[in-house]
Amino acid sequence: AQVSSQFMPALHDTSTKTLSYHFANQTISAAGALEYANYIDVVFNQSDTALYICRKLYRYFVNHDITPWVEQNIIADMAQTFVANNFEISPVLTELFTSAHFYDISVRGAIIRSPLETLCAMLNTSNTTANFDLQSTYQIYLSMYGLADQMGQGYAAPPSVAGWTAYYQAPAFYRLWINSTYIKKRFDVANLLTSNFYNVNGNVFKIKVVDFLNGLSAPASAPQVIDDLCLVLFPKDIPAADKLAIKSILTNSLPDFEWTLQYNEYLADPTNPVFYNPVELRMQAVLNVMFKMPQFHVC
């Protein structure tokens, strides 16, 4: 339904309104139904208005930490673009998203993913979808909603009209997504999606880890598998020691050639559970660990 409004002159204060010192005590003269528009003009004529909005955009998309350099070289330019384009958001975002700063390695991994972003990252990076009958698919995605809610973000159910505090509450901002309760819930979701135990009406919903593996550049090479997974799952590279630890999970602490033999045996007879199951188990174990690493929970 459409929402309408009407101006009632008899109830309107026709006197001149004097604004606070924040607006240099400017006045709004009697203009009837147009006074609100005049007030909006006063607000947007303040240089701080554009800066304030651009800081919010920067915090949402890049980093909550606005240094003096960022304020002078990034925020100020965004604000100029904002004003020059009659306060249209799109040109400002285009400028930000195409800037070298947006892709700088120093700001990668600066934002903790929200619960919905974390859940979608697990599913989307592995090309996981529910392709069952309508009822089962609905129940599965309803369960996904429940998982996000348990992690602290029920879709379309923010705690207040201001939204989730992680998006605006200084000084913690998105660090509010993580506490001793929510981090365990994130780990529980990782366990669930990398196992064979999420069953709805006889349909097992899980990340198809072998299909994910087959889509990598060199599935038979254990070191390359780990490199590819790090590239897909993490915003920046991780230490070599961490990669070795993950690779030992993939190879079950055996030499790399053992993984090559195991994968090639599967490849020669992909429907044989004798060869398929061990590959699936190793990949499930690897993804389970990587989904719990701190690097996965930032973007």
Residue ranges and their predicted role:
Residues A1-P68:
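Non-catalytic, conformational "gating/processing" segments within enzyme and secreted inhibitor domains
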Residues Q46-N85, L93-C299:
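Flexible, low-complexity segments enriched for small/polar residues
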